[in-house]
A protein has these predicted regions:
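C-terminal catalytic/motor cores of large multi-domain enzyme assemblies
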Residues: 1-291
Length: 291
């Protein structure tokens, strides 16, 4: 994304939108809280082509095999790069365009009740594609799974947890004030998952069906994506035949104040096209596709 000279009113992580229409100017003034403006979208993805694509990619990639999760992350990156209004956020009743496309997710260090979790963030570029994102995910996931390492977000939370309770509450209150005005430290913006474009939760990896996750008034994240558990379902063809195919549900929670329903509809159509035709993700994120 092209960097612009920072002007008065801009934030470290976003550019103030100064040319909004009247409706979008008024909306955050009368509906100021992100969590009060959640909308929910569910989309079903046919995994036939993705499964074949993964099989082909993993013929040569054995050390860190490509997975469905990697394809979905790459699909979200390309979708939001091509649909930039999805990368807006509202803070202090103002609209901002985020400076970059970023994704965050939780990594379970081990599949055990008492195992710790780590928070991972990837920062995409206009030229990012499925291969470069796969490499970013490799570094992030392997680093997070190291039981001897603590990610910076978790380390910060532990720091507050070890303080006297009254002091921790006071400092967090200070941070919420800074958050409102965009004065939060850059180190937090870089590593806090709720300052990213989209938070992704792969519930299917722990055998849960697709659901929805709330947004938060802390941070700037306007999109949350839940990945469900894949399953076989009937597909009915026009000639009357029935075929069982592997399907996947995605549950998206979005800030409905950002754009209108038509923009969201076209965005979901693009995401579905990319995930059902994953070879398109080998092109740079900013390269247009027909959908």
């Amino acid at each position: 994304m092209e960097k612009k000279k920072r002007r008065w009113g801009d934030r470290k992580d976003g550019v103030l939108l100064r040319d909004l229409d009247g409706m979008h100017f008024i909306t955050p003034l009368i509906y100021p809280n992100r969590c009060d403006n959640e909308a929910y979208i569910r989309e079903t993805i046919d995994l036939t082509n993705m499964n074949a694509y993964l099989k082909k990619k993993n013929e040569s990639e054995t050390e860190f095999p490509y997975t469905m999760f990697h394809i979905i992350v790459a699909g979200l990156v390309k979708t939001i790069t091509l649909r930039p209004k999805m990368n807006r956020f509202i803070a202090n009743k103002n609209f901002y365009q985020r400076n970059e496309v970023s994704m965050s997710f939780v990594v379970k260090k081990q599949f055990a009740d008492e195992a710790a979790e780590a928070l991972a963030v990837i920062h995409a570029k206009d030229e990012s594609n499925v291969e470069s994102i796969h490499e970013d995910l490799r570094h992030q996931i392997l680093d997070c799974k190291d039981v001897h390492k603590v990610d910076s977000s978790t380390d910060n939370m532990d720091f507050f947890n070890h303080m006297p309770r009254f002091l921790g509450k006071f400092l967090v209150w200070i941070l919420t004030r800074l958050d409102i005005h965009g004065w939060i430290p850059a180190s937090i913006i870089e590593t806090d998952p709720y300052y990213t474009t989209c938070v992704i939760s792969n519930l299917g990896s722990i055998k849960l069906n697709c659901g929805y996750h709330h947004l938060t008034n802390w941070g700037t994240c306007s999109v949350f994506c839940i990945i469900g558990e894949k399953s076989k379902r009937p597909v009915y063809h026009e000639d009357g035949t029935i075929e069982m195919r592997e399907m996947l549900d995605l549950g998206l929670t979005i800030d409905e104040r950002l754009v209108d329903g038509y923009y969201y509809s076209k965005t979901i159509r693009l995401l579905k096209k990319l995930l059902e035709n994953p070879e398109l993700l080998e092109t740079p994120a900013n390269q247009e596709v027909e959908y």
